[in-house]
Curated annotation (Swiss-Prot):
Domain notes: The Walker A ATP-binding motif also binds Pi and PPi.
Pfam families to which the protein is assigned, alphabetical: Hpr_kinase_C (PF07475), Hpr_kinase_N (PF02603)
Note: Both phosphorylation and phosphorolysis are carried out by the same active site and suggest a common mechanism for both reactions.
Purpose of the protein: Catalyzes the ATP- as well as the pyrophosphate-dependent phosphorylation of a specific serine residue in HPr, a phosphocarrier protein of the phosphoenolpyruvate-dependent sugar phosphotransferase system (PTS). HprK/P also catalyzes the pyrophosphate-producing, inorganic phosphate-dependent dephosphorylation (phosphorolysis) of seryl-phosphorylated HPr (P-Ser-HPr).
GO biological process annotation, one example: regulation of carbohydrate metabolic process
Residue positions binding Mg(2+): S161, E202
Enzyme Commission number(s) of this protein: 2.7.11.-, 2.7.4.-
Cofactor(s) listed: Mg(2+)
Active site residues per record: H139, K160, D178, R245
Source species, domain of life: Bacteria
Region (Important for the catalytic mechanism of dephosphorylation) location: 266-271
Identification of the protein by name: HPr kinase/phosphorylase
Amino acid sequence: MSFTVKDIYDKFEVILVILDGEEKMDRVIEKPGLSRPTFELFGPFQSDPIKSAVVLGNREYSYLTSLSPEERKEKTKRLLELQPPVLILTKSFLDPVFLKECNKEYKVPILCTDMYSNELNISIGLYISKQLAKYTIHHGVLIEVYGEGVLIIGESGIGKSEVAMEMLRKNFLFVADDAISIARIGDRLIGRPTEINKHFIEVRGIGILNVTKMYGIEKIKSSAHISIVVELINIQNNQPYNFERTGQKTRYKVIENIKVPHYVLPISSGRRSSELIESAVIDLKLKRDWQYNSGDDFVERYYKYMTKEE
């Protein structure tokens, strides 16, 4: 399904005002993010159509208003001739009158906002990138624990969905089960359910359950930034594996060309998987946000003790 200028306006109607080109709001946006018309205004003529939403801010306004009326008209028409799907004017673009005058021939949708360029990138730019991102399907369960997206993976039947149910009872958030749509957006991984499995989870022996009906809509998250991968391994199969002992070194798993911290947890009777996952998330936050490594702390204390004994 095509992603149009109207989709942006409908999503951000509170902060956007249609200035011109309302009859062309069905124009399709094909490229993610927001672009600035550097070459189109400042450089040699570009002949390729612009396929992304274009932002005009203080830089563009200062340049255009520094030109003579004839040059300003020429440069503005050069941009409009490339038929960008939409122009979004920031708070810094003070006077759009000449832009509207040139646009009579081209009918490019022009939206204005009371926000600055960096604010638009965070809100509208990120929204466009999410909508146009290429998602691939990965097998697992995605939940959010302490604000961190946790992708739980492991062989079929190991208990990933059961762990997710335990986490729900602990008031953590559910994103998706079984088929996870994952896309790279900038340097982040975003995971979400597919249209088919949204809000559903499969628990062996019970069947398909509707998480929203059972626990309430407040336990559902539409998507999550994947911060950590937790892999469950059944050690009862007697498969050799070099498990982490001190936790000094962080393992990583590469998903969509992004390295994600990877914790491998052995599963056996008597071990509460949900509590282990909580501990893994807390350990991640300590290492990443506080630069504290429990393993390093322990080893340092151990060597100090041994040196003292000698």
